[in-house]
């Protein structure tokens, strides 16, 4: 993306014009004042979707007059929203300018954008261009085939990406996980020839704050279902089961690159879930890192197992004061919220309100779903362990999974983000929630 270096006069220019709502129009010598569409002034998720759809149709050079958008907001009663509008435009542009991963011999051409804006907004533009770059990093890893991306490769990718940033990286290898007695993560890993990993990326930039936000990501680099193997269409796209890990790690690097004064750590639980000769089976009982025993009812409910140990690690070993996990956890989300909203579960109303504000500022639609002790009861019916990892009981499967995770938070507030229906759309990774997590961590910097 170019800043204040417009393309030639023959290029289209996008300006934002005022009406009862906001319109986006193109202006070019050969095609003047052609209206593209309208976007409600404060509906930033809709604004984001409209801009992305518009930019993806463009395969040419395009100038965007950001000053026209700023003036539009300043003249309106929603003048306080123009910073969010700028963020939305910049992250939409970086999303559309790049194809993060492709193995095509002739890659498709993307739009090239030059942004025109006043000097006083350059820092804001550059900040969110960086956020967009790390959204694209998450997308790149999401789209990479699982034969090229497994736990060891995932770790190396982030070690390289973080090499010049003020972060600390710690990698718990298989032997470390055994010493720690992370039985749930190790149990899922039993069927794979490749070892599990727990990747920890720490960024501490606010010594005056006692708050530490932990982002925990599910990193199943391929999910076959294990011994409860998936069939047909249910296995297609399971390379995206590591999306949560890619998203949380990318977010921490974005915060570090922009030197946001906050304390945050990413924890990525990495393994494959395969039906090898040594794979765990239904009826096995595993001991979690927090000491609880878990009976395996279904090996395809593996995400909550690896997350459970990672959440406990964030609470006990890293002294997190707030935990947010991101995971492609339950396929039911596609029926509940489709690809429009990400489902959010929270043990704390106050933390939910802060998260909702962050999502609004990021222009990402989220919807809170319920947690209730009744949802956990079917998982407590086992006579042989403290919990089962799943049940044949009908209804509220996504809420039940969230309640299972809450059993491992060690008293720390937990927000669970189920991105099963929003992580990838039309077989392309979206880097969903990188922007929201960035905004949430930035909120703590402003306290």
Swiss-Prot record:
Q: Does the keyword Metal-binding apply?
A: yes
List locations, semicolon-separated: Cytoplasm
Cofactor(s) for this UniProt protein:
Mn(2+)
| Record field: catalytic activity | Release of an N-terminal amino acid, Xaa-|-Yaa-, in which Xaa is preferably Leu, but may be other amino acids including Pro although not Arg or Lys, and Yaa may be Pro. Amino acid amides and methyl esters are also readily hydrolyzed, but rates on arylamides are exceedingly low; Release of an N-terminal amino acid, preferentially leucine, but not glutamic or aspartic acids
Q: Entry's NCBIfam families?
A: PRK00913.3-2
Active site per database record: 230, 304
* Entry EC no(s): 3.4.11.1, 3.4.11.10
Q: Which Pfam families match?
A: Peptidase_M17
* Family annotation (InterPro entries): Leucine_aapep/pepB, Peptidase_M17_C, Peptidase_M17_leu_NH2_pept
List ligand-binding residues for Mn(2+) 1: 223, 300, 302
Protein name, UniProt field: Probable cytosol aminopeptidase
Q: Which domain of life is it from?
A: Bacteria
Name its GO BP terms in alphabetical order.
proteolysis
Q: Which GO terms describe its cellular component?
A: cytoplasm
Q: Which organism is it from?
A: Mycoplasma genitalium (strain ATCC 33530 / DSM 19775 / NCTC 10195 / G37)
| Keywords of this entry | Aminopeptidase, Cytoplasm, Hydrolase, Manganese, Metal-binding, Protease
**Cofactor comment in the record?**
Binds 2 manganese ions per subunit.
Question: What GO molecular functions are on record for this protein?
Answer: manganese ion binding; metalloaminopeptidase activity; peptidase activity
Q: Provide the residue positions that the database annotates as binding Mn(2+) 2.
A: 218, 223, 241, 302
The job of this chain, per UniProt, is described as: Presumably involved in the processing and regular turnover of intracellular proteins. Catalyzes the removal of unsubstituted N-terminal amino acids from various peptides.
Which family does the record claim for this protein?
Answer: Belongs to the peptidase M17 family.
The enzyme's first-digit EC class, named in words, is hydrolase
PANTHER family, sorted: CYTOSOL AMINOPEPTIDASE, LEUCINE AMINOPEPTIDASE-RELATED
Predominant location: cytoplasm
Q: Which residues form a coiled coil?
A: none
């Amino acid at each position: 993306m170019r800043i204040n270096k417009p393309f030639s006069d023959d290029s289209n220019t996008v300006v934002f014009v005022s009406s009862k709502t906001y319109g986006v129009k193109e202006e070019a010598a050969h095609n003047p004042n052609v209206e593209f569409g309208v976007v409600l002034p404060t509906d930033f998720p809709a604004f984001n979707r409209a801009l992305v759809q518009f930019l993806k149709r463009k395969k040419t050079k395009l100038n965007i007059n950001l000053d026209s958008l700023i003036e539009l907001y300043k003249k309106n009663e929603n003048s306080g929203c123009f910073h969010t509008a700028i963020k939305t435009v910049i992250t939409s542009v970086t999303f559309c300018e790049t194809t993060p991963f492709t193995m095509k011999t002739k890659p498709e051409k993307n739009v090239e954008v030059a942004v025109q804006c006043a000097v006083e907004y350059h820092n804001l533009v550059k900040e969110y261009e960086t956020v967009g770059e790390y959204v694209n990093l998450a997308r790149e890893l999401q789209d990479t085939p699982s034969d090229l991306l497994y736990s060891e490769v995932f770790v190396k990718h982030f070690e390289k990406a973080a090499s010049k940033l003020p972060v600390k990286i710690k990698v718990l290898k298989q032997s470390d996980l055994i010493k720690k007695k992370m039985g749930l993560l190790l149990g899922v890993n039993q069927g794979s020839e490749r070892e599990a990993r727990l990747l920890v990326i720490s960024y501490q930039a606010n010594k005056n704050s006692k708050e530490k936000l932990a982002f925990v990501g599910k990193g199943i680099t391929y999910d076959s279902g294990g011994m409860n193997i998936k069939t047909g269409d249910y296995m297609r796209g399971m390379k995206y089961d590591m999306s949560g890990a890619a998203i949380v790690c990318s977010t921490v690097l974005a915060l570090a690159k922009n030197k946001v004064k906050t304390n945050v750590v990413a924890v990525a639980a990495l393994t494959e879930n395969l039906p090898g000769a040594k794979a765990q089976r239904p009826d096995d009982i595993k001991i979690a890192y927090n000491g609880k025993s878990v009976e395996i009812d279904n090996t395809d409910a593996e995400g909550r197992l690896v997350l459970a140990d990672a959440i406990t690690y964030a609470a006990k070993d890293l002294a997190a004061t707030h935990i947010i996990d991101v995971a492609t956890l339950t396929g039911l989300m596609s029926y509940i919220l489709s690809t429009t909203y990400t489902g959010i579960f929270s043990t704390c109303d106050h933390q939910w309100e802060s998260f909702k504000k962050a999502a609004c500022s990021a222009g990402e639609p989220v919807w809170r779903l319920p947690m209730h002790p009744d949802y956990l009861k079917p998982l407590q019916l086992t006579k042989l362990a403290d919990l089962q990892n799943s049940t044949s009981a009908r209804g509220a499967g996504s809420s039940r999974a969230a309640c299972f995770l809450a059993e491992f938070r060690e008293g720390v507030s937990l927000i669970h983000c189920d991105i099963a229906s929003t992580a990838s759309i039309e077989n392309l990774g979206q880097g969903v929630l990188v922007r929201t997590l960035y905004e949430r961590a930035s909120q703590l910097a402003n306290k």
